Amino acid sequence: MSSSDHIHVPDGLAESYSRSGGEEGRAWIAGLPALVARCVDRWELKRDGGVRSGEASLVVPVLRADGTRAALKLQMPREETTAALIGLRAWGGDGMVRLLDHDEESSTMLLERLDGSRTLASVEDDDEAMGVLAGLLNRLHSVPAPPGLRGLGEIAGAMVEEVPSAVDSLADPEDRSRLRGWASAVAELVGEPGDRVLHWDLHYENVLAAEREPWLAIDPEPLVGDPGFDLWPALDTGWERIEATGDARRVVRRRFDLLTESLELDRGRAAGWTLARLLQNTLWDIEDGLTAIAPSQIAVAEALAKP
């Protein structure tokens, strides 16, 4: 790769790694241009457009030697990147961006190129967009679970055990009662955590337009568990748009009904595992120093409550 192709690391990505990764994160960012150059040379690639980034990864559009459009995804090696690689291999491109190659040492992935400028959020009809999500989830959940992924039982059990020491961090007694209630609901489900491969973060922004299919999922954080645990990102996605309707409860309930019917899920279990996501999110917020349950979390819980 020539000097004119030198990668400029986006400021947002550099700041994210500096904030969350400390010295190790800053060192990884400093070595990122050289890592891109090595991967381009190794796979005989050619740069093909400007880079994109999120909080954790850099995506570099490239062309393969045969002219095929692809994308390099670079992310600091972590447990999550290992899980993503396992999941991508298991799905084999079925409803998911296809893994073309990877570098195990650096966790760099060579992926098929999708249209990063067009996400599922661009679909104005919410029922239509939710139908796309449901179809993708159904395909992703149909793949047998590969070895090497964390199980939902372990994760959910740890959350329930954490509640007694975390709940007093919430200032409002009603919030403390909510958290205990969610934990009780999850405790009833821990013994049957499920055996499907879950995406964990499938929402409108993690579905991109593609060439071989209209839409494909990206950025999985796979684990093995009950499909009901995969619903919350879909229920919460585009929250500002939900609030703009003036009836968040109706929209969330409509989405829940559509998803559970399409995926043929037991509604009670799906609601319980969605409460597990609300519990998880709130415990993370408490770790970050927050003292109240986020209003959107409460709204989802109320929408799923029995009439």
Swiss-Prot record:
Location of the active site: D201 (proton acceptor)
Catalytic activity from the UniProt record: streptomycin + ATP = streptomycin 6-phosphate + ADP + H(+)
EC category: transferase
Protein name (database record): Streptomycin 6-kinase
Organism: Streptomyces griseus
Residues binding streptomycin, per UniProt: L133, A134, G135, L136, L137, N138, R139, L140, H141, S142, V143, P144, A145
InterPro entries reported for this sequence: Kinase-like_dom_sf, NH2Glyco/OHUrea_AB-resist_kin
A Pfam family this chain is assigned to: APH_6_hur
Molecular functions (GO terms): aminoglycoside 6-kinase activity; ATP binding
Similarity section: Belongs to the aminoglycoside phosphotransferase family.
GO biological process assignments: response to antibiotic; secondary metabolic process
UniProt-reported outcome of changing G225A: In strain: ISP 5236
Function: The aminoglycoside phosphotransferases achieve inactivation of their antibiotic substrates by phosphorylation.
Superkingdom, taxonomy of origin: Bacteria
Listed EC numbers: 2.7.1.72
Gene: aphD
SUPFAM superfamilies, sorted: Protein kinase-like (PK-like)
Keyword annotations: Antibiotic resistance, ATP-binding, Kinase, Nucleotide-binding, Transferase
